[in-house]
Curated annotation (Swiss-Prot):
Principal subcellular localization: membrane
InterPro entries in UniProt: NADH-Q_OxRdtase_suN/2, ND/Mrp_TM
Subunit structure: NDH-1 is composed of 14 different subunits. Subunits NuoA, H, J, K, L, M, N constitute the membrane sector of the complex.
Gene: nuoN2
NCBIfam families: NDH_I_N
Compartment list: Cell inner membrane
Function: NDH-1 shuttles electrons from NADH, via FMN and iron-sulfur (Fe-S) centers, to quinones in the respiratory chain. The immediate electron acceptor for the enzyme in this species is believed to be ubiquinone. Couples the redox reaction to proton translocation (for every two electrons transferred, four hydrogen ions are translocated across the cytoplasmic membrane), and thus conserves the redox energy in a proton gradient.
Organism: Opitutus terrae (strain DSM 11246 / JCM 15787 / PB90-1)
Transmembrane parts of this sequence: 4-24, 43-63, 67-87, 99-119, 121-141, 159-179, 201-221, 239-259, 267-287, 294-314, 318-338, 364-384, 401-421, 444-464
Protein name in the entry: NADH-quinone oxidoreductase subunit N 2
Pfam families: Proton_antipo_M (PF00361)
Length: 479
């Protein structure tokens, strides 16, 4: 019975996915599919909150429910609920595919929930593929515009890069299995650290990390990001930009913690990835005019910020990285709420189209400025506290140069974020733009994101302590 209750979030989500599958078999009932999707997300969030203190090892030791996994499931469920509400209209998804869109959304979330609890290579691979393949299909569901099939180009790029990254990752898993003789992460945790002086062990770990760095869009695994953001629908882009990255960071924490603290080779590799991602993402974002492409290149830079937390290779650094990516999920979702509402008929939004937003919808304007200022690291929002923790962890670990470069890159990023604010609050449109009417659910989502972003920045102690305490369960997996 305890095992059944511990598995409750996944069971609720599977039940919701089954109900959505039944809906897709009948008439094109988009409204019912939308209601079921939001209800499922709400149920998963309640179930995750109810089981936050549960622990269990399931499926012959391949699946572990602990404080670490359950805390992440709460964040994933909250993000799922936000995306479900955000996907209320799906203006740019083909009409006949809209019910299937919500089904694939549920299946992808099922994979993410399984990903954060998987402690065996086999279940990890299954969860990763389950979370990825529905996203490939969701990108391709965008309707054609003026004979262009940009959504198919984006989907093909996403699939091809994804398959290549997964192939490299599986190759790395093969090395780890050959060195340790097991697919169980607890066994690998026990046997791998003494072997890290071996080139094969370092190669295996590096290849394995490559697959998750692809999900996080870390340089040089970032090539797909701006094109997929631009080619997918606004709602799909909001999903790809947020939730999969949370799952990727969670698994990266499990793998990087395999290395002994102070392992110089891995720390140097992570430092190079962090610097390259920050510099490349911020410099290219400076010249973007399409808002989704700007958020895509900005996401590459933020992936570099996350890697700063991993460089410390201790629990404080890992907790800082998790706190940052959870905050980033909220920040980028706030920006995509504005993109979805400003967009005319689901089209991409240029920065200049934000002109007069403070008059068209004051609530959307506030949501945008909170999201953008948080991304820029302006207090009192979560982006400031999260970035401060990352810098502190790297400073304490002796990576002074990395801290300085991170601060410089953060200053560069402020320029293009202020361009967004300037367009929304100070630029005037040539024509008289119509007011943007928000539905009650969309207004509630805006308020929820504003409160969450502000609250996590003003009072971060509870969240950081919860994450830090949950990390202790990773080290006890082998016991």
């Amino acid at each position: 019975m305890t095992s059944f209750v511990s598995f409750l979030p996944e069971l609720v989500l599977l039940a919701g996915a089954l109900a959505l599958f039944v809906v897709t078999l009948g008439q094109n009932n988009v409204r019912l599919a939308r209601i079921l999707s939001v209800a499922t997300a709400s149920g998963v969030l309640v179930a995750a909150l109810a089981t936050v203190n549960h622990s269990a090892v399931l499926f012959s030791g391949a699946y572990r429910v602990d404080a670490f996994s359950q805390l992440l499931k709460i964040a994933i469920a909250f993000g799922y609920l936000c995306v479900g509400i955000l996907s209320g209209q799906l203006r740019d998804i083909r009409g006949e595919a809209k019910p299937e869109y919500f089904l694939f959304l549920a299946l992808s979330m099922t994979g993410l929930l399984a990903l954060v609890s998987s402690i065996d290579v086999i279940t990890l691979i299954i969860a990763l593929e389950l979370s990825s393949f529905p996203l490939y299909l969701m990108v391709a569901m965008r309707r054609e515009r003026e004979g262009q099939r940009v959504q198919m180009e984006s989907a093909i790029k996403y699939i091809m890069f994804g398959i290549a990254a997964n192939g490299v990752m599986f190759f790395g898993f093969g090395y780890l299995y050959g060195l340790t003789g097991s697919t169980s992460l607890p066994v690998i945790l026990e046997k791998l650290p003494p072997l890290l002086s071996s080139p094969l062990a370092v190669t295996g770990l590096a290849l394995t990390l490559a697959g998750f760095l692809y999900k996080l869009a870390v340089f040089p695994f970032h090539f797909w990001t701006p094109d997929v953001y631009q080619g997918s629908s606004n709602e799909t882009a909001s999903l790809i930009a947020s939730l999969p990255k949370l799952g990727a960071v969670a698994v990266l924490v499990r793998f990087v913690s395999l290395a002994a603290p102070g392992h110089e080779t891995l720390a140097t590799l992570l430092t190079c990835l962090a610097i390259a991602s920050m510099v490349y993402g911020n410099l290219i974002a400076l010249v973007q005019t399409d808002l989704k492409r700007l958020l895509g290149f900005s996401g590459i830079a933020h992936a570099g910020y996350v890697m700063v937390g991993f460089v410390a290779m201790d629990n404080f650094g890992f907790a800082s990285a998790l706190y940052y990516i959870a905050g980033y999920m909220l920040m980028v979702l706030a920006c995509f709420v504005v993109v979805c509402q400003v967009s005319r008929d689901g089209a991409n939004v240029a920065i200049t189209e934000l002109a007069g937003l403070h008059k068209r919808s004051p609530l959307l304007a506030v949501t945008l400025i909170v999201g953008v200022f948080a991304l820029a690291g302006v207090p009192p929002f979560v982006g400031f506290m999260a970035k401060l923790n990352l810098l502190t962890s790297a400073w304490q670990a002796g990576h002074t140069a990395l801290v300085v470069l991170t601060v410089i890159n953060s200053a560069i990023a402020i320029y293009y974020y202020l361009q967004i604010v300037r367009a929304a609050f100070f630029a005037e449109s040539d024509a008289q733009p119509a007011p943007i009417a928000l539905t009650p659910s969309m207004s509630a989502l805006c308020v929820l994101l504003i409160v969450a972003i502000t609250l996590l920045g003003v009072a971060p102690a509870f969240t950081i302590d919860a994450i830090t305490n949950s990390l202790a369960t990773i080290s006890t997996v082998s016991s």
